[in-house]
Amino acid sequence: MKRYIASIFLVLVLFSMELYSQVHKDIEIENKILTAVQKYNENEFEEARAILTEVLLADDGYDAAWYYQAMISVMENDAEFAQECLRNAISLDPENYWYRYRLATLYSHTDQMDLAIDLYENLMNDFPKKSQLYYEMADIYLQNGDYEKALLTAEEIENEFGMSEALTIYQYRIAYLSGNKERALQSLTKYNNQYSSPTILCLLADNEMQEYKDSTALTYYEEALDLDSSFAPALLGKAEVYRITFRYDEYFQNLYIYLKTDGADAIAKTGYLETLLDNCESNFLVSFSPQLDVAMEILTDLYPKESCVYSLKGLYYTYTQRFDEAQLQFQQNARENEDDIEATVTFLRFLWVAEKWKELSAEGLAAFERFPYETLFPEMACIGYYNLGDYNNALECCKTILDNLGEDEQKYASTLSTMGDIYYHLEETKKAYKCYDAVLKITPEDPYVLNNYAYFLALEKRNLKKAHEMSRKTVEAEPDNATYLDTFGWILYLQGKPQEAKPLFKKALLHGGRESSVILDHYAEVLYSLGEYDMAFVYWNLALQKDNGDVPGLKEKVEARRQEAKK
């Protein structure tokens, strides 16, 4: 009996020691996992992964370790391994909501929609009170273009959680995207019959506007303003009703109210006015510039230092041909927002469009000092110098671009193309052609480079066979480009093929060539060589009218041809 009792005691002791050992091991591993989680939260992913890997190598039965391995993989954009880790976590704890939810979202983000849908549907069955699942499920159906299932899911949300403004807008959006406008309006009307919402009223008004039911739209906007007198969409919508019905006094009165409201920010207000300026007829600007000036003053008073207001005013003054005032606005914006690259780019683009080459070159270099990673600025400086005829400084800008390009092969090619043009103007033709050859190795079908290269060879009357082949490619690529047609036609003429050249020039004239003294002169030469003297002099006379020095000695040449024709 004593021996039996002793045996039982020994078993109990051994069992308790084993239990203690297991509990101690679990506590130790849990502490390691907690340390890994802390590292993860501190974005120390490498250290966190090392700890979790050690845990799982010792015992792969810890679901939390697999879960955080997955989260680290997500942060490192390794979706495939993240999915594997989450599946392992779920196999250890199949009821865990977060493991399954994370895997479902990961499937969705990696376009594995069938897997995502299956997992979301299971989650919705197991956790029917989580509204987020329904919305995300509907979004997946939308991405798949399955609007009917998306609408049915939205109806489930309404049945499960009740009607709300946000849900109504969501239902409206889905139905509208599906092309079922009637169903979309039903969702708005259903909500409006039971509740009051300025947002829903504005959506109803917007739909009436699309149907050209201006008076009904105005009624909805006014109802919305009765609920909230400063509701910006209703204020703007009401103003728009007056604008499109040509009631301009009321339009500007309501526009000013909208511009003064706190319900919209500067970006929204300037965005509306920019759209208006971009799309209105020129006579609108002429007729209502005093009223628009007031709108600009309102915005200036409210937002004296806002970049978007400077940009809007610069655009407005440009459209109304007050270029000095426009330049001042763009310049002030760039000066007062020196860290805002977009403000600087907008200013430089204005200088470019306004053809203020001296300012463009200086401001481009100054901008590059502030933004030394942005090669757009030496590009703009190069354009300025090039148009000033300062080819040496333009060339230096190109070299600056090349020194700061990195791996951008396309910009490398375009810069070499510009350098080729510059070298040609500097009469360094070998260097020019070397640049063009380098570009064509990168982009062999570049029509701009092919055309310039071919035309310059034609001007030198050398290697016309190569010039012919390059020019032919440009015309095949852009058959209606007058410049390319002119080059190809001129090469054919130089090759003694004026009859083949003639139709190319006729086509060039149909596509803008009549505005170029060079093209007109070339066509006249072709006609003259074919013995069509009267027509040749018609086009030479047109060339003389258009010429601004583009054809050196044109007047003298035409007179000489006239004398030749009389013999």
PLM features per residue range, with description:
Residues A58, L92, D126-F127, E160-F161, ...:
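Structural marker of alpha-solenoid helical repeat scaffolds
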Residues I27-N31, K260-E281, K305-C308, L312, ...:
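Amphipathic alpha-helical repeat scaffolds of TPR domains
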Residues I29, D63-A64, Y97-W98, K130-Q132, ...:
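Helix-start (N-cap) detector for alpha-helical repeat units in TPR-like alpha-solenoids
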Residues N41-E42, M75-E76, H109-T110, Q143-N144, ...:
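Register position in tetratricopeptide repeats
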Residues V37, M71, T105, D139, ...:
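Residue-level recognition of tetratricopeptide repeat
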Residues L19-Q69, M75-R87, S91, D118, ...:
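N-terminal leader/linker segments that initiate helical-solenoid repeat arrays
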Residues Y68, R102, E136, Y170-Q171, ...:
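Canonical tetratricopeptide repeat
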